[in-house]
Amino acid sequence: MSWQTYVDDHLMADIEGQQGHHLAAAAILGHDGSVWAQSSTFPKFKPEEITNIMKDFDEPGHLAPTGLFLGGAKYMVIQGEPGAVIRGKKGSGGITIKKTNQALIFGIYEEPVTPGQCNMVVEKIRDYLVDQGY
């Protein structure tokens, strides 16, 4: 299965039981910021934004004072699991980023999708990739 298939058929699929509701954008990136696959709606990001995200995984709390930036959009960092997940909020939407040994999995949502639904979608792919050695 190609990386793009993971994004198109899994990360961007309809939320279970919520026909027509899906993430606003999603991507799978390498730790170096290289794009493995992304939705057409995923924001164009700067390399330093990915560097800062990686630093927060290594040094939890790094992004809290400044916020998380992706594609120039600022997200307020909210509770996450140090070293495993970063969550951010922006208006009625937000972002979930989970890390595997080799990849970062991004899910960006807007209402009516909830933070919990976004977390579940991203976590399912993360767990699968970890099981596959990624």
From Swiss-Prot:
<keyword id="KW-0206">Cytoskeleton</keyword>
<protein>
    <recommendedName>
        <fullName>Profilin-1</fullName>
    </recommendedName>
</protein>
<comment type="similarity">
    <text>Belongs to the profilin family.</text>
</comment>
<dbReference type="InterPro" id="IPR005455">
    <property type="entry name" value="PFN_euk"/>
</dbReference>
<dbReference type="InterPro" id="IPR036140">
    <property type="entry name" value="PFN_sf"/>
</dbReference>
<dbReference type="InterPro" id="IPR048278">
    <property type="entry name" value="PFN"/>
</dbReference>
<dbReference type="GO" id="GO:0005938">
    <property type="term" value="C:cell cortex"/>
</dbReference>
<dbReference type="GO" id="GO:0005856">
    <property type="term" value="C:cytoskeleton"/>
</dbReference>
<dbReference type="InterPro" id="IPR027310">
    <property type="entry name" value="Profilin_CS"/>
</dbReference>
<keyword id="KW-0963">Cytoplasm</keyword>
<keyword id="KW-0009">Actin-binding</keyword>
<dbReference type="Pfam" id="PF00235">
    <property type="entry name" value="Profilin"/>
</dbReference>
<dbReference type="GO" id="GO:0003785">
    <property type="term" value="F:actin monomer binding"/>
</dbReference>
<comment type="subunit">
    <text>Occurs in many kinds of cells as a complex with monomeric actin in a 1:1 ratio.</text>
</comment>
<comment type="function">
    <text>Binds to actin and affects the structure of the cytoskeleton. At high concentrations, profilin prevents the polymerization of actin, whereas it enhances it at low concentrations. By binding to PIP2, it inhibits the formation of IP3 and DG.</text>
</comment>
